[in-house]
Amino acid sequence: MAKKSKRIEFYDPIKIEKINPENMALLNKYKVDMAIRELAASTQYAYINNLYQWFIYILDNQNNRSVLELEDDDITEFLYFCKNEGNNTARMRVRISVISAFYKFLRKKKFLTTNPVEFIEAPKKSTLVLVQTFLTPEQVSAMREKLIECRDTQLRLYASLSLSTMARVSAIASLRWDQIDMQACVIHDVLEKEGKLVDLFFNEEVKCLLAKLKEERSISKRNDHGWLFYTGRCTDERHICKSTLEKWCKQIGEYINVPSLHPHDFRHSGATLLKNAGMSLEDVSVLLNHESTDTTKRFYIKQDTARINDIKGRYNI
């Protein structure tokens, strides 16, 4: 499995206040541009966060200069720092892409005549080996038992809801209480891939955990800002980060000796478990919100090889 990139701690609210005013003004114009282009909120957040990190590096190491004054060597210096701090190839490509997109915007608005990132060669794409896990019924049972022992209702709900709804991690991260119909066991108008609004369907186990979590939040008087899943960094506008849910997933995987477990595995596993239990491929595909059953069959269903081998044994060839 590909090793996750090391996290570099740039964030500092005091330093953000000291960032070159011209850089902040240009960033604000870029925010408006992204909003007009209707980029997903998560995409805008990721771009802004990456640019803040770069601005803080400029503040600390390059005399807080304007991005309009920087040359390709200055940007290369920042990228070299990130590489030495442990960022992997995929993370480095993201950093280059974000800075390049920002400069393309500045060039389009005639703040610049050239994009200095054009002179920087991106690292070659690494070959990532991603372990795809299809949880067995036995592993799901073990997961439930371990999560009961840890007494973390939010973590239990995350695992059970992800498996039951088979929703993508980006959708899970943005769920709000007011979308949930407890009686019908449906979560309405969930923003999914390509901007589609879909409904998610959950089981009785999830329904009980939702009620339990709601009661715990009420007793503790915690302000979750309306989000189903939250941490102390959430606000009215900012939901939980996907990276936090990935950490939760890794923790769950360690409980059941599946260290490679990642959020999308709940989606694969739920689909395969339903198919092997007798649900039609067409119905599974609908629940996954796929355009066709071909995608479902090729990437989301693990064939029951034991059953196929048993059938094969009936033929004496």
For the regions a protein language model found, what residue spans apply to each?
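DNA breakage-rejoining catalytic core of tyrosine-based enzymes
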Residues: L112-T114, S126-A142, E194-E205, K221-H225
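Active-site/catalytic core of tyrosine-dependent DNA strand-transfer enzymes
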Residues: N203-V258
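Conserved tyrosine-mediated DNA breakage-rejoining catalytic core shared by Y-recombinases
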Residues: T165, S174-L209
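Short, polar N-cap/turn motifs at the start of nucleic acid-interacting alpha helices
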Residues: I180-M182, P259-S260, M279-F299
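DNA/chromatin major-groove-contacting recognition/catalytic segments
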Residues: K3-K4, F201, R298-I317
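Basic, Lys/Arg- and aromatic-enriched nucleic-acid-binding interface segment
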Residues: L128, V140-V169
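N-terminal core-binding DNA-recognition domain of tyrosine recombinases/integrases
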Residues: F10-P13, N28-L130
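C-terminal catalytic core of tyrosine-transesterase DNA break-rejoin enzymes
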Residues: S160, S164, R267-H290
